[in-house]
Amino acid sequence: NFSLINSEYLKLKINQIKVTGLSDENNFKILKDLDGLILKNIFSINKYYLLNVLEKNNIIHSFKIKKIYPNSIEVKIKKTDLLAITNINGIFFFIGSNGKLINYNFSHKNLPYVFGTIEATDFVNFTKIIEKSKFDFKEISEIYFFPSGRCDIKNKEGKLIMLSKNNLLKSLNLAYRIINNEKFKNSQIIDLRILNHIVLTDE
């Protein structure tokens, strides 16, 4: 009887872990980090160990963990979206939709550049306001954040929009209407810093 119980217990030892959702290189890296689960009982997995391994990887947006009895684990990962590029102390990073900074490489050069200082999580909230507006985030080439809390954006046509610190959504929609109005097609600077006051400059 003891040998039967012991045999069943051994069958529940994890001997296979599958990681999907990222590049082969990143999947393999996470797989190596999860090596500590091999030969652990599938019923007694330390969830904090799993969370620590997965949450320290800034490229991960979310994940699902599935136990496949008797001895396998499957980790399905959703990669974070890369929103923009920023420079911190001379080092370039991507800003992810998960509110984290991700090591930069030379892919995704069409992302907007962020100048100034802003927390990654605050930047994600900023993009959500843009999504609510008529503006297309993909048409933005540069974003400037100032210590006052105000920001400017430049679109891919080179037009600079100086936004109000307050009523950001209203300012964005107003800028969109001006840009798409034939009368103002030559305006290169749209100054909306003061509420209910518009200054257009052709230069």
Question: How would you name each of these model-derived features?
Answer:
Residues 1-203:
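Charged, solvent-exposed interaction patches on well-folded alpha/beta domains
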